[in-house]
């Protein structure tokens, strides 16, 4: 598996499988607007993909230079690749790139997504806030952060 930057057209095409998964499905995310956003972020060099044999297994989208750190705006792993270290590898790459210049790495997760909470805790993130209405009016996001070693 390799981690590489993604071109805008390829980033846009990932939206279909992302919106079919939780938590994006129950939050009402739609493929076309998400695809446009992914394409814009890719043009800015902010989309990385985990690739194996030319297949994208997962992607991470970052927003650099946020609050003395980098914010992981989206992390998604294809269901068939879950549990194979794809998410861990993507976060590790973002950590490496971010911690070279920044003090913090941030991410948020839906408070209902207990698997995400376990995942981020296991990677050394600490929960720092609950943010009602950040992504959807009826949902609560949990803000996580990790300090540069």
Locate predicted features:
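Acetyl-CoA-dependent GNAT
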Residues: 5-74, 78, 91-93, 97, ...
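Active-site acidic-Proline motif in GNAT/NAT acetyltransferases
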Residues: 64, 78-80, 84, 111-112
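Conserved GNAT acetyl-CoA-binding A-motif
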Residues: 98-109
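Conserved beta-strand-loop-alpha-helix junction that forms the acyl-donor binding cleft
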Residues: 107-117, 133-139
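Short hydrophobic/aromatic beta-strand or adjacent loop that forms the aromatic wall/cage
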Residues: 45, 139-143
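Conserved acetyl-CoA-binding loop of GNAT-fold acetyltransferases
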Residues: 121-130
């Amino acid at each position: 598996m390799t981690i590489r930057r993604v071109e805008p057209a390829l980033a846009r095409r990932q939206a279909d499988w992302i919106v079919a998964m939780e938590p994006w499905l129950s939050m009402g995310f739609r493929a076309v607007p998400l695809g446009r956003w992914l394409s814009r972020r890719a043009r800015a060099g902010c989309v990385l993909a985990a690739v194996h044999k030319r297949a994208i297994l997962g992607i991470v989208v970052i927003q650099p230079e946020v609050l003395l750190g980098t914010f992981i705006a989206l992390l998604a792993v294809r269901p068939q690749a879950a549990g194979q270290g794809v998410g861990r590898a993507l976060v590790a790459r973002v950590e490496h790139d971010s911690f070279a210049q920044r003090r913090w790495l941030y991410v948020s997760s839906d408070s209902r997504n207990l698997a995400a909470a376990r995942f981020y805790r296991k990677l050394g993130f600490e929960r720092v806030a609950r943010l009602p209405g950040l992504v959807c009016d009826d949902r609560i996001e949990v803000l996580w952060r990790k300090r540069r070693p």
